[in-house]
Design a protein with these regions (language model features):
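Acidic/polar active-site rim loop that often engages polyanionic ligands
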Residues: 44-47
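Cofactor-/ligand-binding subdomain signature composed of acidic, glycine-rich
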Residues: 52
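Short, compositionally biased "basic patch" segments
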Residues: 55-76, 90-94
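Gly-rich Lys/Arg/Thr-decorated short loops/hinges at beta-loop-alpha junctions or inter-strand turns
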Residues: 72-81, 106-108
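PLD/PLD-like phosphodiesterase catalytic module centered on the HKD motif
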Residues: 1-29, 34-37, 42, 57-59, ...
């Protein structure tokens, strides 16, 4: 058993497991990535998403991730995963920029983020820029939202909703594009400076179309809730 205690300067907040086994065809990697903790107590209270795959692209990235953990190396040398502190925020900002450009070109566009809180100044300013360009943005934020929707000239194309119920909304989902062609990512990282700049976090794409539709269907149901859903108003009330 080799225990790696992580980084001195960064909190490890990612949730990843990689099992390597020998088969008749060679080495196989079974990779699990999650939005929630490996904690038997909070697992009974939190709602999260877990992804398990034998795709070797994920396996190679997971192997590289654990190698970097042992070396205290904040590398960005990954094929498919985004790893904070170097990649997640820049890739989110680039994804928002891409939707702004699509709007300017008259193409279908849109943005969706599900997060526990949104406090990062860079991301908020970029979302405001997207709204000013006319991109519709939906933010599913259970906790703190430092962006106020519906402000003329700034956030009139931003919608912020929250669900607080018996179980804690804990999954993080990023969506870039219109509903029928949205690129979906799952992540351990909230849209907070501490998560994206000061922690080791992972975000990864949902490439399987069936899984993508399951996630979008789950979000459709959540956003149509008529009992627990609350919407943030321009005056700060819900």
């Amino acid at each position: 058993c080799n225990v790696i205690y992580g980084f001195r300067d960064f909190k490890v907040h990612s949730k990843i497991c990689c099992i390597t086994r020998q088969t008749d065809q060679g080495l196989q990697h079974i990779t699990q990535l999650g939005t929630g903790n490996y904690n038997e107590k909070t697992a009974k209270l939190y709602t999260d998403l877990s992804f398990i795959t034998t795709d070797e692209t994920f396996g190679r990235d997971a192997t590289e991730f654990f190698r970097n953990m042992g070396l205290e190396n904040t590398s960005d040398n990954y094929d498919i995963m985004w790893v904070a502190p170097l990649q997640i925020k820049p890739m989110i900002l680039a994804g928002i920029d891409a939707q702004i450009e699509r709007k300017k070109a008259g193409e279908p566009c849109g943005l969706f983020f599900k997060t526990n809180s949104i406090t990062d100044k860079d991301v908020i300013e970029k979302i405001v820029e997207a709204s000013q360009a006319g991109v519709d943005v939906t933010l599913f934020v259970r906790g703190i939202s430092c962006i106020v929707p519906g402000l003329e000239g700034y956030t009139e194309h931003v919608r912020v909703v929250s669900i607080v119920g018996r179980l804690l909304e804990h999954s993080r989902i990023y969506g870039f594009g219109p509903r029928d062609n949205m690129k979906v990512y799952l992540s351990s990282a909230d849209l907070m400076t501490r998560n994206m700049d000061k922690r080791i976090e992972i975000a990864w794409p949902v490439l399987d179309s069936e899984l993508r539709e399951q996630i979008l269907g789950y979000l459709d149901v959540s956003l149509s809730d008529t009992a627990k859903l609350r919407e943030l108003m321009p005056d700060g009330s819900y």
